[in-house]
Amino acid sequence: HMKHLTKKPPGENKGGPRFYNKLPKEDEPLRQKLREESRSNLLKRRSQNLLDNNELRELWMILDQNQSYPDEQLITYADYQKVCSLVSPKVKPYFTSIVFAKLQQGDSQGRVSIMSLFNYVMRKVWLQQTRIGLSLYDSSGQGYLTEIDLENYITELLPTLPQLEGLEKSFYSFYVCTAVRKFLFFLDGVRAGRVRILDILACSFLDDLLELRDEELSKELQEQNWFSAPSALRIYGQYLNLDRDHNGMLNKTELAGYGSGTLTQPFLDRVFQTLLTYSGEMDYKTYLDLVLALENRAEPQALAFLFRILDINNQGYLDAFTLNYFFRAIQDQMRAHGAEAVSFEDVKDELFDMVRPKNPERITLNDLVACGQGDTFVSILIEFHRFWAYENREAVTAEPSQD
């Protein structure tokens, strides 16, 4: 009977661990401040536990002095264990037997390159440093960066990148917008307006951004880097050139001049039906999403973006009716160029053969990504000059080089 009297009410478990603390609300500034302070102190402590440049130099000297084969810069497991006993407590977590096994390069005696070891530690330290750096901008403390968090991060990173020194201050907000869109386009698949910090660390975008610290970066590498000044200025310049009425937005007629100027009318109609517009006009942010999709057509995220536009009935697949809806405009352009229009039946068979969908009459996004030719498939349906290049690929390949 006493047992029943002393029983705790359901849900009350004072002794058990608490795994979840509610986030402070907007009208709780004191709790918010306390949470921010606690996180900031935690990140500071973590930062102090990282290896600094002097400790990394010291590690290299220890590795250098204990390599088993000085001419080859290789180390045996026995010497590796010796190094483990010599390094500081901060370094020890990096020097495990698992790491040694992971860095094996097929050496017949099971030795490992000391350079590989050192680079492994450097990379790990950099990742931890960057994770702490990004976490400082995580306003909710949930391991995500929102669009505003990312904007703050890149705005503060800007002055540390020598390759961006030449940018006009008035262009900064457009640059930040251009940089942030790439993170959101590729890493925010569910369009929640936020990106996981772990996903940022796992992709190459930060490497591309930090490449701009290199003052000697070649023109060619800059042009290939979305985050470089030439790339950002090129994209913004194209937007300004398209904006013929200079109102800062693009209407359908203006967007028709994009790229080769041969995106089809049905595709442009669907772009304006599907994407966020303001009184039928597109802003720079939406334009950037479209550019990222069209410049990276082979990537799954770009295919998902373009598939949504092609799926005119929102049915989750493309069928012969949908393909014909888009291809008619390609046939019209062929006639306008004085060429004989290709039969839709032939193209339809070719497209289905290209994708080999699980259902022989329906092409899903998964089919498109899996076939490895999604970029060609999409291009044939939405852009006349890409279709023409595909149609005449044998002739182009057979032509002698102009060099």
Each language-model region and where it sits:
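N-terminal start-of-domain structural block
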Residues: H1-P17, P24, D149-Q224
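Cytosolic, low-complexity regulatory segments enriched in Ser/Pro/Gly with interspersed Lys/Arg
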Residues: H1-Q73
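Primarily EF-hand calcium-binding motifs
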Residues: L51-S85, K92-N119, Q129-Y144, L167-R194, ...
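Amphipathic regulatory helices of Ca2+-sensor modules
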Residues: I75-V91, V99, V112-K124, Y144-Q163, ...
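Core solenoid repeat modules with strong leucine/isoleucine-rich periodicity
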Residues: G143, G193-I200, D208-R213, Q222-N225, ...
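C-terminal interaction modules of eukaryotic adaptor/scaffold proteins
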Residues: H337-D403
